[in-house]
Regions:
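Active-site and donor-binding regions of nucleotide-sugar-utilizing enzymes
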Residues: 4-114, 217-220, 243-246, 261-263
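Nucleotide-sugar donor-binding and catalytic loop/hinge architecture
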Residues: 20-28, 119-156, 160, 167-179
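A structural signal for short, well-ordered beta-strand segments and their strand-loop junctions
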Residues: 31, 61-68, 156-158, 209-216, ...
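A short, glycine/small-residue-rich beta-strand->loop->alpha-helix junction that serves as a flexible
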Residues: 34-47, 164-168, 186-193
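Short, well-ordered alpha-helix to beta-strand connector turns
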Residues: 85, 209, 250-251
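Leloir-type glycosyltransferase catalytic cores
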Residues: 102-144, 287-395
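Catalytic donor nucleotide-activated moiety binding site of glycosyltransferases and closely related
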Residues: 157-159, 165, 184-240, 356-364
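A donor-sugar binding/catalytic signature common to diverse glycosyltransferases
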Residues: 244-289
């Protein structure tokens, strides 16, 4: 009887704590949205630093390191992006869609216990050297074999290799021959990229007169190089951090498969092409700013952006997964991709941050790509992010 009474007492307490926890989260989201500051949490376990910042109440003064899948960049680059607007919690897709319909997204991870000087030593460009001004190559670039003339424009290609995903699997305790389930996203299995399509991407960029720098060839595996468990000494890691920072700061266009690296390029105002392996997952922040353009097979038209932000958009994923569904995504041909590259090259950094103008350009390119309504269109994400090889956007 005593145990039952104890359970009855514990239940209201646990419910109250749970309610307070979720109310606090919603309050935090709304508070940040009102400040116009960009603070986001990738996963549930990242929430504690945000709580500390919330108690301080001055998000703009929080000590930050801009990170993407464990790849931090320097304080100087953070200063380049800190004036944006928006708030994204991947775990609150419907809530933030309602509050922040412009969909501006950046990921920021709040840190404690590290001074700005320490971060500058580890992650920033050399003191006094601004990014994106045709800098001479840093010493690590020379040793890596990278050949570029000072000030020469180039495209940065993030061609992900299968060994990256194998390393992720092993880190998750999954053998490479097992189906990989991304933590937190049910019923999701990863498909390896088609490396032939990266060769096609290189060819298309070459047609647009872009020398291509392959991030993996020059820097190596970002997952192992820029994580706490990175191999090599501090000097080696520091040099690679410096080189990667330089590449992102000075590239003129960024093309990649599924990777957090697109957050870095996008936040620096770099024209970026995206086609993501997780395209079905409409809870991913990238689909907020870079809309997947959907073709209604019954009405024979593209969904409007308003429809994508509306309640109808919430059922899009289910409709696509259902073979009888009426919605399918639009796939770009190589010609449309080349047109998108030319469009992106023409955009200024200011224009990249104007959501409506960018989306109108995206829609114009996509409408040209649709062609006949009954053609076999399967997938494309146009503009402002990256190509995923296995989606065969360039096939």
């Amino acid at each position: 009887m005593a145990e039952i009474s104890k359970s009855i007492m514990v239940l209201p307490v646990s419910l109250l704590c749970s309610a307070a926890f979720w109310i606090f989260r919603v309050e935090t989201v709304i508070c940040i949205a009102r400040t116009g500051r960009l603070i986001a949490s990738d996963f549930l376990h990242d929430f504690e630093p945000l709580k500390r910042a919330h108690r301080v109440g001055e998000f703009g003064r929080a000590r930050v390191v801009f990170v993407s899948d464990g790849i931090p960049l320097g304080e100087r680059l953070w200063n380049e992006i800190r004036s944006g607007s928006g708030i994204i919690f991947p775990r609150f897709p419907r809530l933030y869609r309602c509050m922040m319909p412009n969909g501006f997204v950046k990921r920021i991870y709040l840190t404690d216990g590290e001074s700005s000087d320490e971060r500058r030593r580890r992650f920033s460009l050399p003191a006094g050297v601004p990014p994106s001004q045709g800098l001479a190559l840093p010493a690590p670039a020379m040793r890596s074999g990278l050949v570029l003339a000072p000030g020469e424009r180039f495209a940065l290609l993030n061609c992900q290799r299968p060994e990256l995903f194998n390393s992720l699997r092993r880190a998750s305790g999954i053998e490479p021959d097992q189906e990989y389930k991304d933590v937190g996203w049910e019923n999701f299995s990863y498909q390896f990229p088609n490396l032939d399509n990266y060769a096609n991407a290189r060819a298309k960029l070459a047609q647009e007169n872009y020398p291509v720098v392959d991030l993996w060839d020059v820097v190596g595996n970002p997952v192992t190089l820029f994580s706490s468990g990175a191999s090599g000494g501090v000097t080696e890691k520091s040099e690679r951090d410096e080189l990667q920072t330089w590449l992102f700061a000075n590239c003129e266009i960024f093309v990649s498969g599924t990777s957090g690296a697109w957050w870095i390029a996008w936040s620096l105002g770099k024209p970026t092409l995206i086609g993501d392996s997780m395209w079905l997952n409409f809870d991913m922040p990238m689909t907020m700013f870079v809309p997947i353009l959907l073709w209604d097979k019954h009405e024979k038209r593209l969904l409007t952006l308003t429809e994508m932000w509306s309640g109808r958009g919430a059922s899009i994923r289910r409709a696509i997964e259902d073979s009888r569904g009426r919605l399918e995504a639009v796939r770009n041909t190589p010609d449309e991709l080349a047109a998108a590259i030319r469009e992106l090259r023409a955009l200024t950094r200011k224009e990249l941050m104007v959501d409506e103008e960018l989306q109108s350009r995206v829609l114009r390119i996509a409408k040209d790509a649709v062609g006949k309504p009954d053609s076999q269109k399967t997938l494309a994400l146009v503009s402002q992010s990256f190509l995923s090889g296995h989606m065969e956007i360039l096939a």
